[in-house]
């Protein structure tokens, strides 16, 4: 399997930083606005495009992003999100599978999946176990957006050997340039401390303004922007300290 790199050994902690700090950035909620999508696509470096399947420009933008050399992922709606593709607790697995198939068909070239909302759904152990097995079968990775402390998604991915990473920092819960800049700097500090950081933002004008200004400065600050496939290899499917102990995700 392309991303299945890991045979976890009990008690092995995540690798200590070796001097190089790595960062991956995901922009969620794409496919809604050609103007915002194009501005996001123009961000420098390997920024990941997370595209919602139930948006008017999902398929066209996925093709455009792939052609531009960006990593494309499916931004999968999960409860409390609504719509024809959304996953909800209590929906039979056969219907969840149908919705996943339909969503992936709307976002060609998807290399992986992350959850849109999903605070209730990512806590559903049976559904997450099935999803991680299905993603592994399809040679896709999973990004746990960690919209809930009760998530078991990354733990189930790790248990099954499905390639995955988890979000460390949300950039734009507060939509001001000052707050977004602080969050980005928090991500930089975290990358330096633990060797890597995964950040998620949205195509808000304020977020794009900050990233357009700050991304060209990352290298001077000792941080290398890498794509998610490289981040998965760098982290070797291990949990960061905020998400588990000794490299193991908390499995609530």
Regions found by a protein language model. Name each.
Residues 2-5, 11-252:
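Catalytic-site microenvironment of enzymes
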